[in-house]
Design a protein with these regions (language model features):
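Class I SAM-dependent methyltransferase SAM/SAH-binding core
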Residues: 55, 60-104
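A conserved beta-strand element that flanks and buttresses the S-adenosyl-L-methionine
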Residues: 116
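Conserved beta-strand signature within the Rossmann-like core of class I S-adenosyl-L-methionine
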Residues: 139-147
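Short alpha-helix
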Residues: 170-189
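A C-terminal cap/extension of S-adenosyl-L-methionine-dependent methyltransferases
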Residues: 192-252
Length: 252
């Protein structure tokens, strides 16, 4: 484990030892917008419910639990922190778990069908390297949620993220960047880039939620995403690998 990863582990351990799970008493608006992201991503991926899924940087594994709620039956969570991982497994008995560093995943190639990560790549020293590791470990697809490199993203978001003295640069993504990384990794273009951007701002949505409720906020969000999604502040990267073609042994 490198020095940066060790510092991240220490920070995550301390956070969950001090605060415990973040999502147990989540306000309804936060629950809606947080769960919408992972539900929409998995819906667009359209993977079989029997898929073997790995969730990296799981923290207390709220997103993994949502994936289980959607009907997926083989979900493994991982984190660099034993404190976070132990908490995740106690909160949801449907999950399996293991300690993994998302920046250097100690697994063979194609170990899982789908690899998922939410808000974790920008904590790595090499976010692009983290995406490449996901591509290596995933047999069929990767999904990650991170800030979007857009005007709204830069205006609404932060350049630097500071947590208990630990500083991270908030690395931002675009569909073109994801495409280029995948080109470089695969050395071909036989993959699908289903990445998309969307509008997501907790404070703004909380204000509207007080007047609109869940149904009204859902309609507002759908409208914003339809008209302004490409300019949105949040991003979902999705790469689907090509289905391997069985080579005819008689063909050289």
């Amino acid at each position: 484990m490198n020095t940066h990863a060790a510092k991240q582990q220490k920070h995550i351990d301390l956070f969950f030892q001090t605060h415990g799970p973040r999502y147990l008493n989540m306000p309804p608006v936060m629950e809606y917008v947080t769960e919408w992201r992972i539900r929409e991503a998995m819906k667009r991926l359209d993977a079989p419910k029997s898929s073997k899924i790995l969730v990296l940087c799981c923290a207390e594994a709220h997103e993994a639990s949502v994936i289980c709620d959607m009907g997926f039956t083989d979900v493994t969570v991982s984190d660099i922190s034993t404190v976070a991982l132990d908490l995740a497994l106690k909160l949801d008995g449907r999950l399996s778990g293991r300690i993994l560093d998302a920046g250097a995943i100690d697994l063979p190639d194609d170990s899982f069908d789908v690899v998922v990560l939410q808000d974790g790549l920008h904590h790595l020293q090499s976010p692009v390297g983290g995406m490449v590791e996901m591509l290596r470990v995933a047999r069929r697809a990767i999904v990650f949620l991170e800030p979007h490199d857009s005007v709204s993203g830069r205006l609404l978001g932060r350049k630097w993220e500071v947590n208990d003295g630990e500083i991270n640069y908030v690395f931002r993504w675009t569909k073109k960047l994801v495409q280029n990384v995948a080109y470089a990794y695969f050395a071909h273009d036989r993959f699908k880039n289903l990445s998309f951007s969307f509008c997501h701002h907790n404070i703004v949505y909380d204000r509207y939620f007080r007047f609109l409720g869940v149904a009204g906020l859902s309609a507002l969000k759908a409208t914003l995403d339809f008209f302004l999604g490409r300019l949105g502040n949040q991003f979902c990267g999705i790469i689907v690998k090509p289905i391997p073609v069985e080579r005819d042994p008689g063909v050289v």
